[in-house]
Regions:
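Long, low-complexity, mixed-charge
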Residues: 21-22
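Primarily the internal scaffold of c-type cytochrome electron-transfer domains
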Residues: 1, 27-56, 61-175, 179-217
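Long, charge-dense tracts
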Residues: 1-13, 46
Length: 217
């Protein structure tokens, strides 16, 4: 992201999900003001060790799970969900959801927003865009032939999970992508985030009664 030239002229809002520095410094000092500033200006003070890290998901003072991405906090609040009062199990999804989700930048001030108001399924989010609730949203890109503004779903993993049988069963992103491990009698959460197919014993077979070969196939 820092070195690509394929998308020139981007704003500071592009950095919202690239590390908690954006919240811990920029947002706490000036709210969403950073979002409309030039990308390079916002990125310049951030050092290599201040991007993704422990504080992306954990409060640096208490190490408890936290959600720092304010676009997600605001969008969930419009659904009457206070993420700061969420259960520990819900937080095991929200820490991922704050960035792994559909989003857009508002026309007024460039802030990050999420189209959750009508629901989390694809049809409800599309309705949100259609009904003019999207804060000046005009489209993600223009079709080169028709010159029509088009909608591009970014990466709606949160919505895909939230409307799944896994969510209904209380299984979160962390259960599958960062499963519990044991070492020397100690139980811990793996922080090697990857496909559950790489940890079928720990991630899948605790719930599924099929064989490992069947699950992988």
């Amino acid at each position: 992201l820092l070195h690509t030239k394929r998308l020139p002229g981007q704003k500071g809002s592009c950095l919202q999900c690239k590390g908690s520095y954006v919240y811990d410094v920029y947002f706490k000092e000036g709210g969403w003001a950073y979002a409309s500033k030039p990308f390079d200006e916002v990125a310049a003070p951030i050092t290599d060790d201040e991007w993704f890290g422990c504080s992306t998901c954990h409060d640096p003072d208490t190490m408890q799970l936290r959600v720092y991405q304010q676009g997600f906090v605001e969008a969930m609040a419009r659904r009457c969900v206070d993420v700061n009062a969420a259960s520990h199990n819900d937080m095991r999804a929200y820490v991922c959801a704050q960035c792994h989700t559909e989003y857009y930048f508002t026309a007024e001030d460039g802030r990050v927003n999420h189209p959750y108001d009508n629901g989390l399924d694809a049809e409800s989010e599309y309705k949100f865009y259609q009904t003019g609730q999207a804060g000046g949203f005009k489209g993600d890109w223009m079709h080169p032939d028709s010159k029509t503004m088009m909608l591009k779903a970014q990466h709606p993993e949160f919505e895909t999970w939230a409307t799944s049988v896994h969510a209904d069963a209380g299984v979160t992103c962390v259960d599958c992508h960062m499963p519990y491990m044991r070492d020397g009698g100690k139980k811990y959460t793996s922080h090697w985030m990857s496909s559950p197919l790489k940890y079928t014993k720990e991630a899948c077979l605790k719930c599924h009664d099929e064989s490992e070969e069947t699950l992988v196939a």
